[in-house]
Amino acid sequence: MERLLSTREVAELLNIHEKMVYTLVAEKGLPATKITGKWLFPRYLVEQWVENNTINFPERIRPLTANQRLIVLAGSNDILLDQTITLYNRSFPGHLAVFGNLGSTGGVQALRNNLCHIASSHLIQDDESDYNFQFAASECEQMPVLVNFARRQQGLLVRRDNPLSIFSVADLGKPGLRLVNRSLGTGTRLLLDRELDKAGLRGDRITGYDHEVARHMDVGLEILAGRADVGPAIEAVAGALDLGFVPLRWERFDLLVSREVFFEEPIQSFFGLLQSDPFRAMARALPGYDVSQAGKIVFPENR
């Protein structure tokens, strides 16, 4: 079960008076449940609520049309995705793909607001049985098409010789350990918070829990520079920076696209690259990727 916060703990987390917490529940939709007369708050839902209410998107743009040559991707960052965008721009002169690093939650919200054509996301669902569908259904008026990009290995980055003997999330409770974390709204942060809950650890008691960086590579660079001992990131970063890696789980990383633009030529050209030899070669050169299902439409596990 996810860790539940008390009213006092939520007030401390949000830096507000306890009475204001009840106002937020009644008027602003702060996620809460009442058990035996006592209000309790799932921490990860509170964090999502904060993220949803602090991102201010500009006015909507029109979805991609057939005479446009621009693809805007937004959401979770990924090393292989960066390389794929470069491959697209090189393969289709006169077309341009660009990426906005908003985290998985921000990407789905950008798709909802027509601020991007493709959202990249790896948001694990409440029961951990699937990815992205639950969040897309709650954020988007119409369910987007989900296309698999890759399965990738998530875990903990450590120094090459792992001097602190970190072998699981439970080891993050060791005294003196310094964590570097990912930003709220990222799928990696959501995964880490879930794993901390399972291990019975509180993030606010871990040094560096609030030390947030925007990209997987930034986590590795903080460890490489000696400013942190451990942080959540994908295995490909460990390979790129010669760091140690503690695997946690394989996850599905999807690309979400609205049905209105799915069949547009630039979109189909981008997805077509996911089944090309150059794409597979790039994936083989990076540790921690499985692209056997890349480019295929994904359907919910429990239909």
Please provide the spans of the model-predicted regions.
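N-terminal hydrophobic or amphipathic helices and topogenic motifs
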Residues: 1-106, 112-115, 138-143, 169, ...
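Short beta-strand-centered segments that line the small-molecule binding cleft or hinge
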Residues: 107-153
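Short loop->beta-strand "edge-of-pocket" segments that line small-molecule binding or catalytic clefts
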Residues: 67-77, 170-190
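Ligand-binding cleft/hinge of the Venus flytrap
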Residues: 85-93, 170, 182-184, 188-211
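Periplasmic-binding protein-like
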Residues: 3, 146-153, 239, 243-272, ...
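Flexible hinge/capping segments at coil-to-helix
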Residues: 149, 158-179
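A ligand-binding cleft/hinge motif common to bilobed small-molecule-binding domains
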Residues: 122-136, 220-249
